[in-house]
């Protein structure tokens, strides 16, 4: 999900909402490699690193056998969200499906923008601009978001 915001130049947008954002320390250090500047910016904006407990790690291993399309980092995210009662933010469809099966609330990039608009944090015009930027990012292969959902939100 963070890559979507990075690709359209709005890495700060989720932090305008009154939420706390966490990522497992392992995922952040090992897999989350868009750029060092992206990592630095996310930490400055307030992204927090979560240390995985032994129980969460064991649950992640269990999830790997149950949800074979998920990486270890995906199962860590699912395990942490489930154990701590957190909402999972992801655009990864297999992870979203596993979260739903596990009773974990899950949302993604488009939901974040819907929240920004609904809460009056961004204007209708800003929302329209961002939706257009996301559509363009999908067209150019920079983001993987459901085009139909984006076009539903686009003004005619």
Predicted regions and their residues:
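Active-site-proximal, substrate-binding regions of enzyme catalytic domains
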Residues: 1-80, 84-86, 93, 104, ...
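Residue-level detector of family-conserved "landmark" positions at structurally sensitive sites
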Residues: 91, 109, 126-127
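Mid-chain, well-packed structural core segment of small domains
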Residues: 96-97, 118
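A short alpha->loop->secondary-structure connector
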Residues: 101-107
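Long, charge-dense
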Residues: 109-122
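A late-sequence structural motif
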Residues: 124, 129-143
